[in-house]
Amino acid sequence: MSTINLPLNLTVRVHPVVLFQIVDAYERRNADSERVIGTLLGSVEKGIVEVTNCFCVPHKEHADQVEAELGYASDLYDLNRRVNPSENIVGWWATGQEVTNHSSVIHEYYARECNNPIHLTLDTSLTAARMGIKAYVCVSLGVPGGKTGCMFTPINVEVTSYEPEVVGLSLCAKTIGVQSNPARPRTVSPMLDLAQVSEASGKLQTLLGEVLNYVEDVLAEKQQPDNFVGRALLDLIHSVPNMKHEEFAKMFNSNVKDLLMVVTLSQLIKTQLQLNEKLTSLTSFLS
């Protein structure tokens, strides 16, 4: 067993796309497969393991051994490196609630692929009220000159996301309750641009109202001031450009014109593609 010296104060940050990929792999598993495993891709920096991608590795588990298609895993990783050279192997994942007897064997392989791999488990069986996410590191155990082994020790794990992922998650959240309410549509289409601007403006107005209420309560000594909140508000004010109303209106109108130009060009391209498709079909029919 490979010796792994890893601090236990690590934090694993998993992006939503990784969780979706794991669930998708679990839904597509073979009928005789009890669980699914795969490779975690991402980066490690200053005690933070950020998992941004993953892929499934076909395998079979027997009573005394594990058979995994390691050649497939290596080829898929090489292909991913061509597209995302910044993503490296940081560990492996498995569906299920707990670590199994075969986990140490699989972890030994990933210990040869990267330094200090992590192990992520996702409870796709939904035994609890929520889909449980756990992360582990393998700590070597034993006495000098005697038998050695390893133990999977839990570490902190949290879900993080980029701004585009937040938009996608917000859209997915609107479909919650579709299964329990058959009258609701099963799909939700993205809103129009102006509708998104209107919704974002409404949320911004609500947040500004909460900030104003907080500031007024602090000034009226109804609430204790918070230095952290004060510094955050000061940074927010300094980040807003100081410009006149006419300059802002000119800049806004310029951006709107650019947006309308992009929309017009997109519609022209769409029309051209549709016309080309019809002409191609007509030519094939005449010939």
From Swiss-Prot:
Protein name: Eukaryotic translation initiation factor 3 subunit F
Family membership noted in the UniProt record: Belongs to the eIF-3 subunit F family.
UniProt-listed Pfam families: JAB (PF01398), MitMem_reg (PF13012)
InterPro entries listed in its UniProt record: eIF3f (IPR027531), EIF3F/CSN6-like_C (IPR024969), JAMM/MPN+_dom (IPR000555), MPN (IPR037518)
GO cellular component: eukaryotic 43S preinitiation complex; eukaryotic 48S preinitiation complex; eukaryotic translation initiation factor 3 complex, eIF3m
Subunit structure: Component of the eukaryotic translation initiation factor 3 (eIF-3) complex.
Claim: Cytoplasm is one of the keywords in the record: yes
Protein's cellular compartments: Cytoplasm
Source organism of the structure: Culex quinquefasciatus (Southern house mosquito)
Every MPN domain range: 12-142
GO biological process: formation of cytoplasmic translation initiation complex
Keywords, comma-separated and alphabetical: Cytoplasm, Initiation factor, Protein biosynthesis
UniProt GO MF annotations: metallopeptidase activity; translation initiation factor activity; translation initiation factor binding
HAMAP family found in the cross-reference section: eIF3f (MF_03005)
